């Protein structure tokens, strides 16, 4: 029988480890504890953001359940960045970087202390992929516990979420909203703890982790403030101890087939563009053969069957009441769009987990549809290619009145410059805004363009203006927007060669993003282009810029390292 402390005994057994044990005795350990599995609890609690401010109760529940199940819990902290608070500022450059820092910090503690398993608890966007990357890297038994969604806010009879506040800025600047109502939206959009409530990035990733098999059924759509979320954290800890006993490891669960399941669910629920970047990073960490083209392959197979914000109607709490991710998965499974034989952290297969879930969603709900009555016949996250982005870029293409647009480029070398022009109402119908030098290396950090896109929506330009960037978009973004353009401007990608007024085409049907300039002219501009000086030469952002891969490879920092 496998020893449950197979890893941790490296620091607890033998005469030579007497000093090591002394450190544990200082924290109240007893001799009998050294034969128990030592399980880390990666606790993302902080008062930086409502996404993470409700995590301590989940960590406490996990610790209690671990100890009751015969493990010894070891709690350590992981950092977070609030995308909603950093949005539109230089601070947002740290958001994607924090994904790498979170993965690194968990790897440090799990491997540095020889932990036998780990419960990862996170809330805000980058907590999710950062934690999963660490689980894939370390490959010790692990489970992901999502902190839970926020509940909707209300003002003047209207249901609100954080994107309501971003869009209200544009409504105010265009004279469509009073200052009093702007303040009202601001104060009521976020009523308590939990991650942003639509199918934005955090809820997209939590849903995908449930489909991946690394989180418990129904856990991804629970509200943070509800008692069932605490109970789910405790159950997750108990399940993790069983995984330690059975030596069930992340790479047994995270396979190409289970990633296909996860991406199928992302398409079905209308998830965030960031999921493309993050699953490229997760599969890289798990050493799975996965490329940006795999998303397009699955998009063509899987319809959108869940009506969720930002482009739809409902929030995660509504999805939970309608049957949650298991209901979505059962519909996909019955339609031959999921692999039912994939193992989950529970030890059961996907098919076994979904055995008792109804094949048809309840008639009294409107959130989840059937395959023969989808919102859209194909998925919404399309991979566009063309001379602007030969490596591929990402667009949300469903729900657009005008899936194709050709117009004059309005070129900005930073988000800040673009936002100033939008706020000054200098962007008009038919324009295509180009925001560049915001890529992994050039930004650095691929800031999310929620502030400019929301301002355009608030000004009534969401359907008539295109936006192209080598940065990212928030999960709350909608409209004719294309992100993750690769190669990025900083390395001389064609996006760096677009001039003000150039004709640019975005065609969702043809999956095309094109600069309508002759090849000879592009070659001439490329020969004249000079790489700008890096914006940072010391510190974390400089380190990230020097190590980051292309967005088409996940913008990770441990790929193709020069170790000579």
UniProtKB/Swiss-Prot annotation:
UniProt similarity note: Belongs to the IlvD/Edd family.
Protein name listed in UniProt: Dihydroxy-acid dehydratase
Keyword Iron carried by entry: yes
Assembly behavior: Homodimer.
GO MF, one example: dihydroxy-acid dehydratase activity
GO biological process: isoleucine biosynthetic process; L-valine biosynthetic process
Binding site for [2Fe-2S] cluster: 51, 124, 196
Substrates-to-products reaction catalysed: (2R)-2,3-dihydroxy-3-methylbutanoate = 3-methyl-2-oxobutanoate + H2O; (2R,3R)-2,3-dihydroxy-3-methylpentanoate = (S)-3-methyl-2-oxopentanoate + H2O
InterPro entries tied to this protein: DHAD_IlvD/Edd, Dihydro-acid_dehy_C, DihydroxyA_deHydtase, DiOHA_6PGluconate_deHydtase_CS, ILV_EDD_C, ILV_EDD_N, IlvD/EDD_N
Positions of the catalytic residues: 474
PANTHER family for this protein: DIHYDROXY-ACID DEHYDRATASE DAD, DIHYDROXY-ACID DEHYDRATASE, MITOCHONDRIAL
């Amino acid at each position: 029988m496998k020893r449950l402390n197979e890893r941790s005994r490296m620091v607890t057994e033998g005469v030579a480890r007497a000093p090591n044990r002394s450190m544990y005795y200082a924290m109240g350990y007893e001799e009998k504890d050294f034969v128990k599995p030592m399980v880390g609890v990666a606790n993302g609690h902080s008062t930086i953001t409502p996404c993470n401010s409700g995590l301590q109760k989940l960590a406490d529940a996990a610790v209690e359940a671990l100890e009751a199940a015969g493990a010894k819990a070891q709690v350590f902290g992981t950092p977070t960045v609030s995308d909603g608070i950093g949005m539109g500022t230089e601070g947002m450059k740290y958001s994607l970087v924090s994904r790498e820092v979170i993965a690194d910090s968990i790897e440090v503690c799990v491997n540095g202390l020889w932990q036998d398993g780990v419960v990862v608890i996170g809330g805000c966007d980058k907590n999710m992929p950062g934690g999963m990357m660490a689980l894939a890297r370390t490959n010790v038994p692990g489970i992901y516990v999502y902190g839970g969604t926020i509940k909707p806010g209300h003002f003047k009879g209207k249901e609100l979420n954080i994107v309501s506040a971003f869009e209200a800025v544009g409504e105010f600047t265009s004279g469509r909203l009073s200052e009093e109502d702007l303040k009202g939206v601001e104060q009521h959009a976020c009523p308590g703890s939990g991650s942003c409530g639509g199918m934005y990035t955090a809820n997209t990733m939590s849903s995908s982790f449930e489909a991946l098999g690394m989180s418990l059924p129904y856990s991804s759509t629970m509200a943070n403030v509800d008692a069932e979320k605490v109970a789910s954290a405790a159950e997750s800890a108990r399940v993790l101890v069983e995984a330690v006993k059975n030596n069930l490891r992340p790479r047994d669960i995270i396979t190409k087939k289970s990633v296909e399941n996860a991406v199928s669910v992302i398409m079905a629920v209308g998830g965030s563009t960031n999921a493309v970047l993050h699953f490229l990073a997760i599969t890289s960490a798990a050493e799975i053969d996965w490329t940006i083209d795999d998303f397009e392959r699955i998009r063509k197979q899987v319809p959108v069957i869940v009506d969720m914000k930002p482009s739809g109607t409902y929030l995660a709490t509504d999805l939970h009441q309608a049957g949650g991710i298991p209901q979505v998965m059962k519909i996909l499974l019955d339609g031959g769009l999921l692999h039912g034989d994939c193992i989950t952290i529970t030890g059961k297969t996907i098919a076994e987990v979904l055995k008792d879930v109804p094949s048809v969603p309840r008639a009294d709900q409107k959130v989840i549809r059937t395959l023969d009555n989808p919102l859209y016949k194909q998925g919404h996250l399309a991979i566009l290619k063309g001379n602007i982005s030969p490596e591929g870029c990402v667009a949300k293409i469903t729900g657009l009145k005008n899936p194709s647009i050709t117009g004059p480029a309005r070129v900005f070398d930073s988000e800040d410059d673009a936002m100033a022009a939008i706020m000054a109402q200098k962007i008009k119908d038919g324009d295509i805004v180009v925001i560049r030098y915001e890529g992994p290396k050039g930004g650095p950090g691929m800031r999310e363009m929620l502030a400019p896109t929301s301002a355009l929506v608030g000004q009534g330009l969401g359907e008539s203006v295109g936006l192209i960037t080598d940065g990212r978009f928030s999960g709350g973004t909608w409209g004719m927007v294309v992100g993750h353009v690769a190669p990025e401007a900083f390395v001389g990608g064609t996006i760096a060669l677009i001039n003000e007024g150039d004709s640019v085409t975005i065609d969702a049907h043809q999956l095309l993003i094109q600069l309508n300039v002759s090849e000879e002219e592009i070659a001439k501009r490329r020969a004249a282009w000079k790489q700008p000086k890096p914006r940072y030469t010391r510190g974390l952002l400089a380190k990230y810029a020097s190590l980051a891969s292309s967005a088409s490879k996940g913008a990770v920092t441990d790929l193709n390292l020069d170790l000579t």
